[in-house]
A protein has these predicted regions:
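A short, N-terminal "cap"/entry segment at the start of jelly-roll beta-barrel domains
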Residues: 2, 14-67
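A short hydrophobic beta-strand segment most commonly corresponding to one strand
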Residues: 132-143
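Conserved metal-binding segment of the jelly-roll/cupin
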Residues: 110-129
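His/acidic/aromatic-lined binding-pocket segments of jelly-roll/cupin-type domains
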Residues: 63, 70-73, 108-109, 116-117
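Short, conserved beta-strand element in jelly-roll/cupin
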Residues: 66-87, 93-104
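Bacterial N-terminal signal peptides that target proteins for export
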Residues: 1-7
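A generic "binding-loop/recognition-motif" signal
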Residues: 67-68, 123, 132
Length: 143
């Protein structure tokens, strides 16, 4: 009976064991990318997501992503995040990504180390007033 249970368990686990696309990036490799990053460094990319480490010491410019949701975890520092409002004077590329210009209106919040942020596709956003070095991981999820 025990042998049958073990065999059944292995059969059920086979799809999990055979999964592809699993990625583990060792802490030492991430630390190397973090130390080398002037502004950002790509950790991993597929057609469904892009994972980056970003480093900011100056104000950003407004962004709005047509098809990407930003998921971020702040590692160090603090920054003022404005979301919503209206972007003007920006450029939009062929993929629907808006950069530059100015952001009017919106909601402002100060984010700190340890905070989790999720900015849905289509929402204008802007990071300003970084205090010292602002470090964060961002995964852009294609919707």
């Amino acid at each position: 009976m025990l042998n049958r249970l073990i065999a059944a368990g292995l059969l059920l686990a086979t799809p999990v064991l055979a999964q592809t696309g699993v990625l583990v990036v060792p802490a030492a490799e991430i630390a190397q990318k973090v130390n080398a990053a002037a502004t950002s460094s790509t950790i991993a990319t597929t057609d469904k997501y892009i994972s980056l480490f970003s480093h900011r010491t100056v104000d950003g410019t407004p962004e709005q992503h047509a098809n990407w949701t930003d998921v971020m975890v702040v590692q160090q520092g603090e920054v003022t995040l404005t979301t919503g409002g209206t972007i003007s004077g920006n450029t939009v590329d062929a993929k629907g990504e808006s950069h530059g210009g100015t952001l009017a209106g919106g909601t402002t919040v100060v984010v700190h180390a340890g905070d989790y942020l999720q900015i849905p596709a289509g929402v204008p956003h802007l990071m300003t007033k970084p205090k010292g070095d602002f470090h964060y991981f961002v995964t852009k999820v294609h919707i």
